[in-house]
Amino acid sequence: MFRSIAVLSALLFAFASAKTCKYDSSDFEVYWRFANNSINMQFMNTDIKNNEWTGVGFGDDKNNFVGVFFMVSNNQVTVRTGSTTQHGPPTFTQSGTNTASVSTQALNYFPEDKTMSAVVQIPIQFNGRSLQSCQKWRFVKSGKIENGQLTRNDKSPKEKKVCPMECN
């Protein structure tokens, strides 16, 4: 427990020491800032179980948005990029295609707290879209992972209109 608090505190301090934006809800705590043509983000889901997925999507069309998705399996977190719809499971970007990659600084899962935390750097030109302009960000609570396959998410993603350039 102390270890999880120490890691989360260090991550929060790193983001809090710069000008940041924040989204906070009952299930999420997300911090981000725009720098060097990237969005530096700490994404934390505070109610996710093993064998579930979560993520953040970008785009005004709820039936077609790109995103960064986090899978918790065997108490380990992996990250992938792709696209999805309001309730559908993500379709992942194929490796080797001409898409911008997400850089991962930290991935942590604390099963006793059901908390997943990730620190990622997302390029402003992401999967064929520009994240520079104001648009809706969609925070996907969770979906199940069954036999290695992601299922649809149970709840509609929470939305927030974000203008990442105005946070710096």
Swiss-Prot record:
PROSITE patterns: DOMON. InterPro entries: DOMON_domain. Residues 152-168 have a biased composition (Basic and acidic residues). Keywords: Glycoprotein, Secreted, Signal. Pfam families: DOMON. Glycans are attached at N36. It is found in: Secreted. Residues 148-168 are annotated as: Disordered. Residues 1-18 form the signal peptide. The keyword 4Fe-4S does not apply. Residues 26-143 form the DOMON domain. One of its GO terms (cellular component) is extracellular region. This is DOMON domain-containing protein Y73F4A.2. It comes from Caenorhabditis elegans.
